[in-house]
Regions:
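A helicase ATPase "motif cassette" and its flanking acidic/Ser/Thr-rich regulatory loops
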Residues: 1-160, 169, 173, 457, ...
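Pre-P-loop entry segment of helicase/translocase ATPase cores
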Residues: 116, 123, 128-248, 286, ...
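Conserved helicase NTPase catalytic core signature
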Residues: 181-237, 478, 482-610
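ASCE P-loop NTPase helicase motor core
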Residues: 233-235, 239-397, 568-719
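Helicase C-terminal subdomain and adjacent C-terminal extension
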Residues: 372-373, 653-698, 821, 857-932
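Extended, charged coiled-coil helical stalks used as long, distance-spanning scaffolds
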Residues: 395-511
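Conserved helicase/translocase motor-coupling segment
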Residues: 717-811
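Conserved helicase C-terminal RecA-like lobe
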Residues: 780-875, 879, 887-892, 908-911
Length: 932
């Protein structure tokens, strides 16, 4: 993409055509300064406010009245005019004009058509349209800068033997959110149900002195009867805090509602989501059991689609569609492309799970995922390409015919039902045994048995007895109680239960353990029960497979109609029929994902309150007004994120935000720049805790991603030392001997005092040179099995100009740094591995180089004002963190910036010593040139 600002009458079109590419230009006309627009709003809404304050947007940011396309013959294209609402809404908000949007659009379209008839040049058309727009909207002329228009050129390579596809407008003005918000407001005025959006906007604050992470609460929420019947078939159970969150969210969203979970980096948010998905699927299996024959769940409808008849699916099966949404496209894609991987299930379940494998393999292959799949559990649908891909995969499945024995040794319906009932009975039986074990422990406690003084095993106690100190008995009383025949019988039964259940953690054992051990101790369950819950999910998937085979005719008919609907959402269709099609598709693929921006397109045919389960990932990054439409379509919403990681990016200035709040009386928590969807969902969740001055939803506290010092830096920066680092296998895997440079020397701050530091330059070339040197050494010193591969690392900076400078340095030195590695491979790796902190939310690497840059206090203060940016940067690293920068510039506040001092005397390393640390090898040491 090439952007040209046109300030004169000189023709901006390229003089020579590139035959290897097809190119199309779009002319953005009616250019207006965003700074001027901000000032106009502030003056209108809050005239007493100083609109010249420094946080107003930069001078070089513009908005536009609209755009049109220019053909290869340098003529405006008929029918290509797009009119933006921004300037119209600005005029409406400031009461500059009373013209309607329809009248305004018709005016510009008429002018455009008239100019086309006279064969006017594109620049003349742009000026005429701009004049008409500003006159019609009665906007002040000083909004118009010297730039007459902006020309955007977009190109695509021409592939040999294929017809060049027409380049479409990249929706320059296609922000869907204003239209969605207007429709939501209208629905509220019409008294329609708006799902979870109503709770988010109207419920009072639930903040209190309650602490969801305290021992009493954890033990209470881990009582056996609170556990879901099924879990994801992993070799490992959830941590107690994850399990508390899962138990509580199902208890609080039985029919509707919002539940928020606070997940710091590396605390297992994805793992938690997998358990939620497993339980929802297993709950649907309970409904499937009701049908003596799978065909009984379907009823033919009078009307159908262009592809034939459709069927109504029993309404009891409408409640299991799962949608995952986020502002972050990478987050939703990563989640829904991770769940189907065979690596995500435990080894003992590998041969038992093989759910619609052809469909699963097609879905992963469409997204260039080469990992083997266990089943078609999820798919990303968040843009048209993804929807077309999925529709194609489903169409191929229909063409293949009914899933047969080659797919999963499909059992007959009766056998599948019997196996599921047996698995469910096993779970129920083990839960009953746990309840009985708890009752026996209570009885033993009441009689004061199992005292150490009597020589028995350590006491079996409940949480209440441990807290109340009711075990203080004399030795004589203990011996007398232990000899009581009832208590002796209870002890025998307790021992028998332990032998059958396997590993069991009793409340007293949990309370007596140190925090690190406690973080992995699940109370209320056992090895046997965890295995049985996973087996139930396996049986549920087999039941679904058998159900699909038994009702393939109505299912395939509905799938044909679904593929038509999802590929062409503009064709509409009633919500009443859509829910039957979506519920049918959900039998095959239970989880779908989308960004908020595309959510309304994916679920265009479903109305408000129609999606049974919405899971929002990375909610701390999501602006509430972006998410509100998705919430309005959902019955239940699970909001997962972290207010101490990256915050939403807001294009609105603080001045306009303040003026807007003043004009319309907006409470602070609902203001655009005050928080995120996560903070609003946390606000109404009574099951939470206060951390770092903020009320958060159910906290996840067990960290498994990073080793030291990254864990302690993050824990101190953002979480008041509430997280616990456990089972750190990464530490044990550190290379030794000749392979010690595989991950590099210990984490450190490399103190670089750049001779070229300047207040107005963010990039310090000396810092970039050291970063490139380290990258080259890490690439050269990789273990033999990885020699020749580029290292698993990220180069991160708070500032875009620093990231661009490092990328430029690296590409200039690539032959010296990486030997014979192909330039396109290096370029792709650099694009993927070097960027700002905002590029890496949700990602991780073995090594992170945090290159700080900047020398002026104001920029540094911006990066450090909140813990969010540094918290995310530091926790991208699993094994090594190398901070590169001038610590004298960055250390500003002795309490806030204490992490910069490190935990050991070797943390601060001068630049020369840093190079020496990476040079202790007989290999060639490259000499890199600075790119200034």
């Amino acid at each position: 993409m090439v952007v040209t600002h046109v300030s004169s009458d000189r023709d901006p079109w390229p003089s020579m055509r590139d035959e290897t590419k097809t190119t199309r230009q779009f002319v953005r006309f009616g250019v207006a300064s965003m700074r001027g627009c901000d000032s106009l709003l502030v003056q209108r809404w809050r005239p007493d406010q100083d609109s010249r304050e420094p946080d107003l947007v930069d001078n070089d940011r513009f908005t536009f009245a609209g755009s049109f396309a220019v053909s290869g013959k340098n003529a405006a294209e008929k029918g290509s005019l797009v009119v933006s609402r921004f300037l119209f809404d600005l005029a409406t908000a400031t009461e500059s004009s009373t013209i309607t949007f329809t009248e305004y659009t018709n005016l510009l379209e008429g002018e455009f058509k008239n100019r086309l008839k006279t064969r006017a040049k594109p620049l003349a058309i742009a000026e005429a349209l701009a004049d008409q727009a500003f006159i019609a909207l009665k906007l002040p002329p000083d909004l118009r800068p010297s730039v007459k228009c902006v020309v955007v050129s977009r190109s695509k390579p021409v592939k040999e033997g294929k017809k060049a596809r027409k380049i479409r407008d990249a929706r320059l003005f296609g922000n869907a959110y204003p239209g969605l918000l207007r429709q939501l407001r209208q629905d509220v005025e019409d008294c329609l149900v708006i799902g979870g959006a109503w709770d988010l906007l109207t419920q009072p604050s639930a903040e209190s002195d309650f602490d969801a992470g305290c021992d009493d609460t954890v033990l209470e929420r881990l009582e056996t009867h609170r556990y879901p019947s099924a879990r994801w078939p992993s070799d490992f159970s959830l941590s107690p805090y994850q399990q508390v969150a899962v138990n509580e969210l199902f208890a609080r969203t039985s029919r509707e509602g919002i539940f928020s979970i606070n997940g710091p980096p590396g605390t297992g948010k994805t793992t938690l989501v997998m358990d939620v998905v497993a339980e929802i699927i297993s709950r649907r299996a309970e409904i499937l059991l009701r049908f003596d024959n799978p065909l009984d769940a379907f009823k033919a409808t009078a009307s159908g689609s262009d592809h034939g008849s459709t069927f109504e699916i029993d309404s009891a099966l409408h409640d299991f569609i799962i949608a995952v949404a986020s502002s972050n496209n990478g987050a939703v894609n990563n989640l829904t492309l991770e769940l189907p991987k065979r690596s995500k299930i435990g080894e003992r379940y590998g041969k038992q799970l093989n759910y619609l494998p052809k469909l699963a393999e097609r879905i992963l292959a469409q997204h260039q995922v080469t990992s083997p799949a266990w089943g078609s559990v999820s798919v990303p649908l968040g843009n048209k390409q993804n929807r077309d891909r999925c529709a194609s995969a489903v169409a191929e499945l229909i063409d293949d015919g009914c899933p047969d024995d080659d797919d999963l040794s499909t059992r007959n319906w009766g056998e599948a039902c019997a196996i599921y009932r047996a698995a469910k009975a096993r779970v129920d039986d083990l839960k009953a045994k746990h309840v009985r074990l708890d009752e026996l422990a209570r009885s033993a406690d009441e009689f004061g048995s199992l005292q150490k003084a009597a020589g028995a095993r350590p006491p079996v106690v409940t949480a209440s007895s441990a807290r109340n100190g009711s075990l203080a008995m004399s030795q004589a009383e203990a011996m007398e109680a232990a000899s009581h025949p009832i208590i002796a019988a209870s002890q025998r039964q307790i021992e028998e239960a332990r032998e059958e259940l396997g590993k069991v953690v009793l409340p007293a054992e949990f309370l007596d353990a140190d925090p690190r051990a406690r973080a992995e101790m699940l109370v209320g369950t056992s090895t046997a029960l965890e295995d049985a819950r996973a087996d139930l999910f396996v049986a549920a998937m087999a039941l679904h497979q058998s159900f699909i085979a038994g009702a393939w005719d109505p299912i395939s008919a509905n799938l044909r109609a679904w593929t038509e609907r999802i590929a062409h959402p503009e064709t509409g269709g009633s919500p009443s029929s859509a829910v039957h099609l979506w519920s049918t598709f959900s039998l095959l693929v239970p989880v779908v994902s989308s960004t908020f921006c595309s959510f309304a397109n994916v679920f265009a045919s479903l109305g408000r309150d129609a999606i049974p389960w919405l899971i929002v990932d990375e909610a701390g990054q999501a602006a509430a007004h972006h998410a509100i439409d998705a919430l309005s379509r959902a019955k239940r919403t699970i909001v997962i994120g972290d207010p101490f990681q990256l915050e939403p990016i807001s294009a609105i200035s603080s001045s306009v935000d303040d003026a807007l709040a003043s004009r319309f009386g907006i409470p602070r928590e609902f203001r655009s720049k005050a928080g995120s969807l996560q903070t609003l969902a946390d606000r109404i969740n009574p099951f939470g805790a206060r951390r770092n001055g903020k009320w958060i939803g159910a906290p996840l506290l067990v960290h498994r991603r990073c080793i030291e010092p990254m864990f302690s830096i993050s824990n101190a920066l953002a979480y008041e030392h509430s997280m616990v680092l456990v089972n750190n296998a990464l530490q044990a895997e550190n290379p030794v001997g000749n392979d010690r440079l595989a991950f590099g020397p210990e984490s450190a701050w490399f103190n670089v005092r750049g001779a070229s530091e300047m207040p107005d330059r963010f990039y310090v070339p000396e810092e970039g040179a050291l970063a490139c040197y380290i990258m080259s050494r890490l690439a050269e010193c990789r273990p033999p099995q990885h020699r020749g591969q580029l290292p698993d690392l990220f180069v991160i900076s708070p500032f875009r100009k620093v990231a661009l400078g490092i990328r430029e340095d690296l590409l200039a030195n690539a032959p010296t740094m990486f030997g014979h590695t192909a330039p396109d491979v290096v370029e792709e790796w650099a694009e993927r591995s070097i960027g700002t902190v905002h590029s890496f939310q949700g990602k991780e690497a073995e090594i992170v180089l945090l290159v700080l840059g900047a020398s002026d206090a104001e920029s540094i203060s911006w990066a450090l004002a909140k813990p969010n940016i540094m918290n995310v940067a530091v926790t991208r690293a699993r094994r090594r963190l190398y901070v590169i920068g001038n610590r004298a510039n960055w250390f500003q506040d002795s309490s806030r910036d204490a992490w910069m001092l490190g935990q050991g005397r070797d943390w601060l390393v001068d630049e020369a010593d840093a190079r020496a640390l990476f040079s202790r090898s007989p290999h060639h040491k490259p000499h890199l040139r600075l790119v200034v």
